[in-house]
């Protein structure tokens, strides 16, 4: 985004309101991790929400760095860890950046391990940078009271209309 475009007062008011909202259960996923269940937002959901909030051309993401932290080969298998820094910039120049991490263990292929770890690190960094803008972009997931309440809320059914 080369030119800065200021948000209108109406856009600022709407964004301030919307960014304070919490994610609905349809945007949350869970997986088992250290210490039990882990709640997260998938990468495509975070991008979808950013497009809805800021407009498809109202924000950009930039991969600022991608670093292979380690690569170990043993018995024909590969373990790799990668860290990434992503910056999210809004049309008015406001930005946040954060670090993400990705890894692959016990892979048969060095290429497959690197691909998975790099994509995972970049997506993790993107989601972590987006969450800094507000609750509706994932920051609410860090509120343990919120995530414990969401375990008991059913996801709404999806209705697809084809015209």
Ranges and model annotations:
Residues 3-13, 46, 53-161:
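Positively charged, aromatic-enriched nucleic acid-contacting surfaces
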Residues 1-47:
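N-terminal, Lys/Arg- and Ser/Thr-rich interaction peptides
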């Amino acid at each position: 985004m080369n030119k800065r475009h200021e948000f209108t007062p109406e856009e600022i008011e709407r964004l301030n309101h919307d960014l304070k909202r919490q994610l609905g259960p349809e945007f949350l996923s869970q997986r088992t991790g250290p210490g039990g269940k882990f709640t997260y937002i998938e990468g495509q959901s975070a991008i979808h929400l950013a497009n809805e909030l800021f407009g498809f051309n109202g924000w950009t993401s930039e991969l600022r760095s991608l670093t292979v932290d380690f690569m170990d080969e043993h018995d024909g298998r590969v373990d790799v860890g990668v860290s990434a820094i992503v910056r999210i910039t809004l049309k008015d120049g406001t930005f946040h950046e954060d670090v993400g991490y990705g890894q692959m263990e016990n892979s048969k292929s060095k290429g497959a391990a690197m691909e998975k770890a790099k994509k995972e690190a970049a997506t993790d960094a993107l989601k972590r940078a987006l969450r800094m803008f507000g609750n509706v972009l994932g920051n609410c997931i860090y509120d343990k009271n919120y995530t414990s309440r969401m375990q008991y809320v059913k996801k709404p059914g999806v209705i697809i209309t084809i015209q």
